């Protein structure tokens, strides 16, 4: 048994926020209350000054297996997640081969059994990411797929998307969408505007996102499907999601830490380590994302953890791949830029990083109560630390060298300590 003493337990399900102890027995939260130390515990953790929260859940990561394991693999990705306080992640399907069939899905599922945290795998919406024919969603759901996404590529056939939504509604699974109309993207990875012009690039206009978000919100309203707008970056799109929710659509949006922290100006400082799709946008867009997080329009924070090798990111801007890593800095960026700046309460932040993403994928996790699975993160929200090295195979991050608040000290998954600072 493990006794966690003197911590500030924050649980978004019950709205509990109090100094109280937890006992973990086997893989469950056995008791919540006030307990004395004794020899019966194998481990006693003094969580004084720390928040004790549900293990974090990230619904948007790339662990690059199969096909690109020189960038990341399931083991290294899981360890990176554990260091960041995450106990469950959902991997995207843009691997090689693409996860669009049961064999590839089962390969990842089998490899994930040895991971230190819960690694779940989403499947593609269309075969081969070609946007022409739906995968066998029913068979894949039976195999254990929690949701479907062609993340990395936008889906352009509206009728096919409507078919997918009707099927997803029937199967009670979410569909997650990467929203960028390629015909409106001059150069990916940088916002169309002043910075793109300085770099001699056309950039990617926010309207490329807006038109796709508008379409998918309306299709979600029509079909009743549960739809996730991935890595929202445009302020106008935030307003559209808010309106779609008002109309009754089951639409959720996820924001990445880089989109609520940085702006297009940071591309000039960090170069390819600030290149991602969708790109960093204007200060106005960033402020609209923070507003959306604050008022509940954006329910989920997800990293879009996208590892690349140093050689790939060292190429010139236009040739370098898009994406940055995020698992090891996500919580601290939320604490530093949202909680400490009074945009969100600690309860709201934890909610957007645990129970809300779990609900999207119909997972019965993300909360602290007796009998629940013992997935726990223990972190000091006031401890300052400098981002220096990563557990991930990659280090493509614009936050290297930055001082952040919020240090993860323990991550416990299924009752086992999987990370200890």
Curated annotation (Swiss-Prot):
Source organism (scientific name): Clostridioides difficile (strain 630) (Peptoclostridium difficile)
Keywords in alphabetical order: Hydrolase, Metal-binding, Pyrimidine biosynthesis, Zinc
Pfam families associated with the record: Amidohydro_1
EC number: 3.5.2.3
A GO cellular component entry from the record: cytoplasm
Protein name per its UniProtKB record: Dihydroorotase
Residues bound to Zn(2+) 1: 60, 62, 151, 304
Catalytic activity: (S)-dihydroorotate + H2O = N-carbamoyl-L-aspartate + H(+)
Signal peptide: none
Recorded GO MF terms: allantoinase activity; dihydroorotase activity; zinc ion binding
Record-linked CDD domains: DHOase_IIa
Cofactor entry: Zn(2+)
Family: Belongs to the metallo-dependent hydrolases superfamily. DHOase family. Class I DHOase subfamily.
Record's cofactor remark: Binds 2 Zn(2+) ions per subunit.
Residues that coordinate or bind substrate: 62-64, 94, 277, 308
Annotated positions binding Zn(2+) 2: 151, 178, 231
Any one Gene Ontology BP term: purine nucleobase catabolic process
